[in-house]
Structures are given as C-alpha cells and as structure tokens.
Regions:
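ATP/nucleoside-binding phosphotransfer catalytic cores, i.e., glycine-rich phosphate-binding loops
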Residues: 2-10, 29, 34, 39-41, ...
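A glycine- and small-aliphatic-rich helix-loop capping segment at beta-alpha/alpha-beta transitions
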Residues: 83-94, 116-117, 183-192
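Ligand-binding beta-strand-loop-alpha-helix segment within the catalytic cores
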Residues: 8, 16-38, 45, 92-169, ...
Length: 304
C-alpha cells in the first residue's frame, strides 16, 4: 500500500481522494498504480492490441501443443471483429481453445434470456464471432462455456479440470465491476474482501446504477429494456487466472475516466471491485490495465 502514501487517505472511496485521483497527470498514473498500466492513443489501437493478445496466446500455446483457456467479456466488443480477421487470415487452429464467458443476463425469475433477446450476450457472440470464424479452424460448441444458472458449478469444475485459466480478458464497469461482480449491497448482511475474492459463479440482481449505465450504452436509455438479473463468473475464477488484462475503451463514455483511475490508483475496496485486481499475485507484472489516451487524461470536474 506504500504506493498510495500521500495520495489516498480513506479505505472507502471519498470525495477528497477522488479529487486527487482524478487530477493525477497521465504520465504519473503508473507511479501510483499497483497494477501494470498501458496508455494507447486511440480506441481502435486498443481493440487491435486486445485482439492481437488473444490471438497470440492461442498461437503460442498451439506451438507448445497445449490447450488455451481464456475468460472473455461481452464488453468491450469491437476487438472481436479484429480477432475474426486475424484468426481467418492467419489460419489459427482453434481446436484446443477453451472459451469461458463472463456472464449472461437473466429474466426476473433467474432464467436465461433467449439468444434472440437484443441484450443476449450469447446471441451477440454467435453473430459477431462464432458464425464469422472459418469452420475449418476447429472451434466446436463444446469448447464454449457460458455460466449456467441451472448448474452454477459447471464452468468452475471445467476450469479446474483443464488446469486453470491462462488469461482473463475484461472491461471495467461503472462502479468497478468485473463481469457482473458488482459491489455487494445489503442493508443487513456484510462480507469481507476475502469473502468477495472467494465468490464463485452465482446469480445476482443488477444494481440500480448498472441498469442506468447499461441502458444508455445498449438500449437507448430504456432502463425497462435491461434484464433485471444476471449469472456471472466469480471473482475466484478471475483471480486464479495466471494473467488478467482489462481494457477501458471509454473515450466516448464519460464515466470511464474515473473507473479507470480508481482501479489503478485507489487501494483495494469492496466499493469498487476493480481495485481488488491489485491483490493478484505480483499484480504489477500479472495485471495489465489498458486505456486510450482520452480515457486516461486527468479530469478536474469542470463542465464540458
């Protein structure tokens, strides 16, 4: 925690600490960060880097004749178009690739929404990734694992059977959630950071701010179009990954500068689960947070 000495004074997020965090010059972020930080010029460059990273881990493991096991998000998403081009053009064999997706929306009863639903992650990935990959690359449906509300241990057991995750890719949500591991919110019940880090695949109710932000990003501001629940991979599976790569592509999403800076420069807190990545094994080397320059620039709070 010595990295934060003189910067952050509160364990929970406070106004005074946020003023400091938001004003740190871009070139000093790495000085105060316990995780690796990479700043790129544009979101297009970010998507290309993310797709290339995904492709390279598959290629490298193919050369070693070992399977590749990665956790993938459905957000950000533009990197998948680039990944399809790389895989098809370079004829990357996918027969030993295992894909574990982070989450999926549920209806109010806790059942999976249909793939035809406009908010379905399964439907989106089928259309924008799986159906576009050349069939001779060898990726089968059995290699694609989604969290299942009817069998919550399925993905956990499969990850364990395969020997763990090589890389977890993801974004960071409005209040710092990774996948749908949102800040725990209960009037009566309390959990510790240790409890949260040991959380496994589970069903959650969306927080109110997630409704708002996701409706703006994906439903034209229609909060009623956002399914109320979700099934998410647990923090345990994420934190047990050998490497974690998070990407903040929020140049046009005005909430992402704060999310990015908190994840990198605020001490671990349940208020913002993204900060818990700092508790990964040797996080300066094993956790990398990438942002485009517009997202990473300091924000002083003045109206734009």
């Amino acid at each position: 925690m010595n990295k934060f000495e003189g910067l952050v004074t509160h364990q929970t997020v406070s106004n005074i600490d946020m003023e400091k965090i938001m004003s740190i010059p871009l070139e000093e972020i790495d000085k105060y960060s316990n995780v690796g930080v990479r700043i790129v010029e544009t979101t297009n460059e970010l998507y290309k880097i993310m797709a290339r990273s995904m492709a390279d881990i598959i290629i490298n493991n193919n050369h070693k004749d070992i399977p590749t096991k990665i956790i993938l998000p459905v957000g950000p998403t533009p990197q998948y178009e680039v990944l399809v081009q790389i895989c098809n053009n370079e004829k990357i064999k996918l027969s030993r690739l295992w894909l574990f997706f982070m989450d999926e929306y549920l209806d109010w009863e806790g059942r999976l929404i249909p793939e035809s639903h406009p908010m379905s992650f399964r439907g989106y990935m089928k259309k924008h990734l799986f159906e576009l990959l050349n069939s001779n690359l060898g990726l089968s449906d059995s290699q694609i694992i989604w969290p299942d509300p009817a069998d919550l241990d399925n993905n956990c057991n499969k990850i364990k059977e395969l020997g763990g995750i090589d890389v977890c890719y993801g974004g960071i949500g409005y209040h710092g959630h990774i996948a749908f591991n949102e800040p725990f919110n209960s009037y009566y019940s309390r959990i510790t950071i240790k409890d949260f880090l040991n959380s496994r695949t589970r069903v959650i109710d969306l927080n109110s701010d997630t409704f708002v932000v996701n409706s703006i990003c994906g439903a034209g501001g229609n909060c009623y179009g956002i399914p109320p629940r979700a099934v998410t991979i647990g923090m345990k599976q994420i934190m047990e990954s050998k490497r974690i790569e998070l990407y903040c592509d929020g140049g046009d999403l005005k909430w992402q500068p704060a999310t990015f800076r908190i994840a990198c420069m605020h001490p671990p807190t349940l208020d913002r689960p993204g900060t818990l990545m700092q508790l990964h094994n040797d996080p300066k080397k094993t956790v990398l947070v990438t942002a485009d320059r517009r997202t990473a620039e300091p924000v002083m709070g003045a109206p734009k």
